[in-house]
């Protein structure tokens, strides 16, 4: 990730320390036009606590997915990996505080790849793109197309579908073949 910046002429030390320099520059808002779980919470009395809970939830999700795959490692298939990846790229920015619309780009791309590989799930990229559209529209037009919690609800549904799909793949009794 740093190589293009260095090749373009940015000093190596500046490139390495860029994110450390920006650590204190994050605003205090829990949500910056993103379809995250914080789109449901408009008036939070203790934003610092909510941010810590969101961060803990994201780490818990990540740890749970990794532990689940470790526990079911003999049942891992390419389909299970695809489902697990979708859980992570949707779930982590969905749960983390201070997210912007751009943090869901990987979810947009991976949900599209998922739908191409498993056409029965054609609705997943539509829901992800709908959620992203709400965030990008708010940023670019400086007004909301719809309330951001509609996008958050769409991503919550994508997350649930990805969890159910992955569970079906990791538990061979219920595994479905798609190819």
Describe every region a protein language model picked out.
Residues 11, 15, 102-105:
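Membrane-spanning helices that line or support transport/gating and their immediate boundary helices
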Residues 1, 112-120:
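Hydrophobic transmembrane alpha-helices
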Residues 96-107, 140-148:
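Membrane-interface catalytic loops of GT-C/OST-like multi-pass glycosylation enzymes that act
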């Amino acid at each position: 990730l740093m190589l293009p910046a260095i090749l373009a002429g940015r000093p190596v030390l500046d490139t390495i320390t860029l994110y450390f320099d920006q650590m204190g520059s994050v605003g205090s808002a829990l949500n910056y036009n993103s379809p995250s779980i914080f789109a449901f919470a408009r008036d939070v009395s203790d934003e610092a606590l909510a941010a810590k809970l969101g961060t803990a939830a994201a780490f818990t999700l990540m740890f749970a997915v990794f532990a689940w795959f470790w526990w079911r490692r003999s049942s891992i298939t390419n389909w299970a990996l695809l489902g697990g990846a979708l859980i992570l790229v949707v779930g982590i920015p969905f749960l983390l505080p201070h997210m912007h619309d751009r943090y869901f780009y990987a979810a947009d791309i991976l949900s599209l790849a998922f739908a191409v590989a498993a056409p029965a799930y054609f609705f997943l990229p539509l829901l992800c793109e709908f959620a992203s559209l709400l965030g990008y529209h708010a940023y670019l037009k400086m007004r909301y197309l719809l309330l951001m919690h509609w996008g958050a609800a769409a991503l919550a549904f994508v997350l649930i579908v990805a969890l159910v799909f992955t569970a079906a793949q990791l538990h061979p009794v219920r595994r479905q073949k798609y190819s």
